Amino acid sequence: MRVLVTGGSGYIGSHTCVQLLQNGHDVVILDNLCNSKRSVLPVIERLGGKHPTFVEGDIRNEALITEILHDHAIDTVIHFAGLKAVGESVARPLEYYDNNVNGTLRLVSAMRAANVKNLIFSSSATVYGDQPKIPYVESFPTGTPQSPYGKSKLMVEQILTDLQKAQPEWSIALLRYFNPVGAHPSGDMGEDPQGIPNNLMPYIAQVAVGRRESLAVFGNDYPTEDGTGVRDYIHVMDLADGHVVAMEKLADKSGVHIYNLGAGVGSSVLDVVNAFSKACGKPINYHFAPRRDGDLPAYWADASKADRELNWRVTRTLDEMAQDTWHWQSRHPQGYPD
C-alpha cells in the first residue's frame, strides 16, 4: 500500500515507518520537524531497507496535503502529527487545539477532496478520563480528560466519528495508546525528547547516562502495591506492529474501529526504575516528591479486542523495554545529531 505518515519522523512515527517499509509498503513522511530531527530519516531508510519519501511541511497546510495525496496516489493515512506534552498543553492550550484539532480537520478535508478514505488515528488512553473500573475497555464511555492535550485527542475522535457517520464509506481506526516506551533493538532509533523529558522511561534513561541528576517519583502514598503510580507500558515496536496490522486489516473496511493498544498489565514507577537499573547495571538515583494534580493512582488496558479482531498482542516485556531503551541511550547519549 501507499501510505502517508504524518509526524513520521517522531518517536512512534519513525518506528512505525520502519515496520511499514519492512512489510513492503511505500511510505511518504510529512513532518514539520518541530518535535523531531531530520537525522532520523537515513536511520529509517537503513532499518526499513527501503527509501521513504520525506516532505517537510505542516498538517495545517491543506493544499500541500492534497498535492501529496494526488502525486503519490496515497491509499491510506496514518496520522501521528500533533503536540503531545500534557503539562505544556495546560500552559499553551490554543497551540494544542490549533495543531491537533485544526490540523486534523485540514488533513481529513484534503483526504475527502482526494477521495482517500482510510485513516489510522494516533489517539490516547487519556480519552477515558478517570474511570471507576480497571482495566479500561473500549466500550467504556469516554470521560473528561484533565488536559487540553487529552481533550484535543477526544475532540478529534468525536470529529472522525461524526465524519464516518456522515460518509459511511470511510474506514477510521482510533488506536488508543497507553504508555509507549522502548526503542528499536538495533540501538540506533529511540525516543529523543526535546528539552526535559515528560515521560518516565526517557527521564530514567537520562539519569542513567548522566544527563540528569535524579528522578522525582511523584507520590509514594497511592493505594498500590508499592505506593507509586501504576501504568500500562507498551514497547514502541509492539505499538508500531499494531499500526501495520490495523492498516492492513482495516483497509476499505468501512466503520469506526476503536482499539486499545497496551500490554494489559500495570507496572509501578518503582517497577520501571528496577527494570532499568537491571538493564544498565547500576542503581537509578531517585527521590520521592508530592503527588501531581490530576495523576491517577492506577490504570491499564484491556487489549483483548485487538487480539481477537486484529490478531495483535504484545510480545515484549518490561525488561526488554528497559534493555532496548538503555541500548539506544547508551549508544546515543545526546540523542540524534542536530
Curated annotation (Swiss-Prot):
Gene3D superfamilies in alphabetical order: NAD(P)-binding Rossmann-like Domain, UDP-galactose 4-epimerase, domain 1
Active site positions: 149
Catalyzed reaction equations: UDP-alpha-D-glucose = UDP-alpha-D-galactose
One Pfam family matching this protein: Epimerase
Keyword set includes Endoplasmic reticulum: no
Keyword NAD assigned: yes
Family stated for the protein in its record: Belongs to the NAD(P)-dependent epimerase/dehydratase family.
Protein name: UDP-glucose 4-epimerase
Organism listed in the record: Salmonella typhimurium (strain LT2 / SGSC1412 / ATCC 700720)
